[in-house]
């Protein structure tokens, strides 16, 4: 509103002062003490004059929200009826924390007087998502992917990938698929290759990364025979991430990044529809011309999938014994100490973010051939990460990364800052190790975290000292299920977490073998 005429500025300020005068029935001697405040916001179209407002020290969030709405209504109406303005609830951030008490209580806690001018930032208030539904599966849920509308993809330690319908989560059985390679192997991660819900990439405890197509709509467990196995990792795969780009009008390519307990990161380029080139092969000797075979001489003909090697391999933690030396010694490569690594893609497929149990956090420039572009060193053990998204028109996201740690903390790492390691440390964010973080798909300020304490929290980086709200996975999803845990059972670990594409719902899964859906409304909306 800085570009509004001065008369509108004066009218808005005058209206705000009028709204704060005591009613005639209250004598000035009994009027509450006042404190000067300044109000600012980053919400587009919601700024009010940045001038001191004298408000009663007894005011709380609701009265402050009324003040902002009154000034906005008067200024935006520019003399017209205020009835057309629709009030919006606001929250207020002071000194990096949401205001959850009266102004005088805040001043008392800080040992400040009412003469101090308080700087408050107002943001749109968000109601917490409410538990909507849940489904149970046979084993722990190791990861969830809710990026596809109305489809929830889960990986499980029983080696099965399941696809749930979010509209009928508890009532409709999931489509269940067992990749052929994972019949006796636990899956650690599963991601959609693209938004059409027909292609999937999985990671496993065996170190295999596999890309395959969903074979149909069966609701029973079926093997997937045409899985392209991407071979590199010599230890369990700890994380995978995917970015899709259109190379021409008819083809899409998917970039996959995988990270493992061996300390390495592999970057792969695959067809986004998971349709790989194949070559027919028989049981005959190689090099012989194939011919039609009959009778007892007939041998089975199969299609061998041509799988690509990694585009590049990065070592977040230098191996104690590398692949070349291991081959010379006729032994297996040996990872370095604390080599367990996680990774994610940023800026589409132009950056790779990674963190390892050795306490290092890095990002790599893929365009420059995988060169190390930034490094942070901490005394923490990272368990999960997700890059913050930028809503600007810039082609690059802000080089910031959210990490969850073994010591129950969260941290924001800003690679624009060459001095400090953690730009924002959030100690005691949970009561147990933080196992999952997920940045909001719409808002540049919000992210969610899940932990071994069974809690899910939503945070605003503008108010890092406390979560916006905390959710708990319900102990029982159905009163008809007698085998469910009792209400006295301690909370179980959250292992997977994701937002739906519109950012209005959270999906979680974990140790309790359940997939839970929490539905909200207008979460992360940055306008009025």
UniProtKB/Swiss-Prot annotation:
Residues 33-124 are annotated as: Ubiquitin-like (UBL) domain. InterPro entries: G-protein_beta_WD-40_rep (IPR020472), NLE (IPR012972), WD40/YVTN_repeat-like_dom_sf (IPR015943), WD40_repeat_CS (IPR019775), WD40_repeat_dom_sf (IPR036322), WD40_rpt (IPR001680), WDR12/Ytm1 (IPR028599). It holds the Pfam family WD40. PROSITE patterns: WD_REPEATS_1, WD_REPEATS_2, WD_REPEATS_REGION. It is found in: Nucleus, Nucleolus; Nucleus, Nucleoplasm. WD repeats lie at residues 136-174, 182-222, 232-278, 334-374, 383-423, 429-469, 489-528. Residues 1-10 have a biased composition (Basic and acidic residues). SMART domains: WD40. PANTHER family: RIBOSOME BIOGENESIS PROTEIN WDR12 (PTHR19855:SF11), WD40 REPEAT PROTEIN 12, 37 (PTHR19855). Keywords: Nucleus, Repeat, Ribosome biogenesis, rRNA processing, WD repeat. Belongs to the WD repeat WDR12/YTM1 family. It comes from the Eukaryota. It comes from Malassezia globosa (strain ATCC MYA-4612 / CBS 7966). The keyword Repeat applies. SUPFAM superfamilies: WD40 repeat-like (SSF50978). Component of the NOP7 complex, composed of ERB1, NOP7 and YTM1. The complex is held together by ERB1, which interacts with NOP7 via its N-terminal domain and with YTM1 via a high-affinity interaction between the seven-bladed beta-propeller domains of the 2 proteins. The NOP7 complex associates with the 66S pre-ribosome. Interacts (via UBL domain) with MDN1 (via VWFA/MIDAS domain). This is Ribosome biogenesis protein YTM1. Component of the NOP7 complex, which is required for maturation of the 25S and 5.8S ribosomal RNAs and formation of the 60S ribosome. Residues 14-29 have a biased composition (Low complexity). Residues 1-32, 276-304 are annotated as: Disordered. One of its GO terms (cellular component) is preribosome, large subunit precursor. One of its GO terms (molecular function) is ribonucleoprotein complex binding. GO terms for biological process: maturation of 5.8S rRNA from tricistronic rRNA transcript (SSU-rRNA, 5.8S rRNA, LSU-rRNA); maturation of LSU-rRNA from tricistronic rRNA transcript (SSU-rRNA, 5.8S rRNA, LSU-rRNA). Disulfide bonds: none annotated.
């Amino acid at each position: 509103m800085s570009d509004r005429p001065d008369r509108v500025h004066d009218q808005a300020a005058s209206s705000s002062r009028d709204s704060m005068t005591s009613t005639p029935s209250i004598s000035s001697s009994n009027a509450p003490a006042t404190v000067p405040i300044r109000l600012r916001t980053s919400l587009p179209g919601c700024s009010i004059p940045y001038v001191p407002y004298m408000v009663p020290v007894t005011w709380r969030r609701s009265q402050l929200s009324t003040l902002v709405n009154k000034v906005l209504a008067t200024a935006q109406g520019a003399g017209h009826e205020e009835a057309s303005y629709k009030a919006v609830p606001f929250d207020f951030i002071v000194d990096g924390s949401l205001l959850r008490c009266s102004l005088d209580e805040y001043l008392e806690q800080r040992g400040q007087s009412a003469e101090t001018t308080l700087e408050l930032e107002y943001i749109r208030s968000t109601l917490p998502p409410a538990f909507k539904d849940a489904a149970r599966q046979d084993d722990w849920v190791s990861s969830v992917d809710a990026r596809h509308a109305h489809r929830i993809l889960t990986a499980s330690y029983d080696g099965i990938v399941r696809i749930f319908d979010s509209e009928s989560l508890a009532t409709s059985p999931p489509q269940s698929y067992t990749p052929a390679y994972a019949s006796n192997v636990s899956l650690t991660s599963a991601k959609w290759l693209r938004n059409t819900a027909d292609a999937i990439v999985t990671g496993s405890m065996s170190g295999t990364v596999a890309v395959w197509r969903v074979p149909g709509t069966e609701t029973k467990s079926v093997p997937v025979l045409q899985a392209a196995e991407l071979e590199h990792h010599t230890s369990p795969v700890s994380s995978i991430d995917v970015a899709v780009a259109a190379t021409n009008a008819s083809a899409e390519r998917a970039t996959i990044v995988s990270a493992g307990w061996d300390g390495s990161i592999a970057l792969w380029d695959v067809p986004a529809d998971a349709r790989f080139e194949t070559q027919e092969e028989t049981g005959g000797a190689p090099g012989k011309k194939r011919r039609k075979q009959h009778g007892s001489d007939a041998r089975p003909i199969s299609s061998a999938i041509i799988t690509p090697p990694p585009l590049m391999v990065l070592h977040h933690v230098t191996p104690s014994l590398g692949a070349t030396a291991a081959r010379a010694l006729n032994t297996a490569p040996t990872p370095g100490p604390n080599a367990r690594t996680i990774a994610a893609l940023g800026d589409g497929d132009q950056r790779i973010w990674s963190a390892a149990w050795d306490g290092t956090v890095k990002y790599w420039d893929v365009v420059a051939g995988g060169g190390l572009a930034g490094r942070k060193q901490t005394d923490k053990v990272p368990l999960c990460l997700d890059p913050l998204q930028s809503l600007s028109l810039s082609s690059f996201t802000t080089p910031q990364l959210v990490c969850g740690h073994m010591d129950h903390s969260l941290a924001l790492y800003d690679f624009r800052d060459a001095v400090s390691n953690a730009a924002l440390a959030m100690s005691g964010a949970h009561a147990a190790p933080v196992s999952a973080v997920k940045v909001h798909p719409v808002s540049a300020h919000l992210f969610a975290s899940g932990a071994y304490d069974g809690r899910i929290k939503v945070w605003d980086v503008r108010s890092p000292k406390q979560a916006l709200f905390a959710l708990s996975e319900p102990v029982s999803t159905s009163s008809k299920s007698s085998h469910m845990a009792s209400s006295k059972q301690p909370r179980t670990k959250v292992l997977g977490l994701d937002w739906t594409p519109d950012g209005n719902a959270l999906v979680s899964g974990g140790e309790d073998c359940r997939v839970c859906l929490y539905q909200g409304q207008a979460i992360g909306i940055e306008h009025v």
